[in-house]
């Protein structure tokens, strides 16, 4: 019986970590050199001219330090302009899971896309080693 318990303990210590954003149903990934940002919008379907929020996790890759904060913005590359509103980013509940110290959870409120077209989400991830931008494009119809 002890052997089975020891084997189970050893096997559980090699279990893979949950993927970045594993708790965010429907999340998509933005990526930089040292970070993944898994995010989803609330509501899930963004409407032109309506405020929305972004729930997200930052996940450090390899030996990169954990994020200490994030700024969220969006830009329309074809039009050369960004949003007319500035997002307010706050740590989310359970912002630093004890079992995953290189993951941090946030919520950004007050975003609005004022016209249809391609928008690039910008996640500027701050850490002890500097700031990196993770990007992801979405098309709003």
Language model: regions and residue ranges:
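Sec-dependent signal peptide recognition
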Residues: 1-7
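Hydrophobic h-region of N-terminal signal peptides that target proteins for export
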Residues: 8-17
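Contiguous segments within soluble domain cores/interaction surfaces
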Residues: 18-141
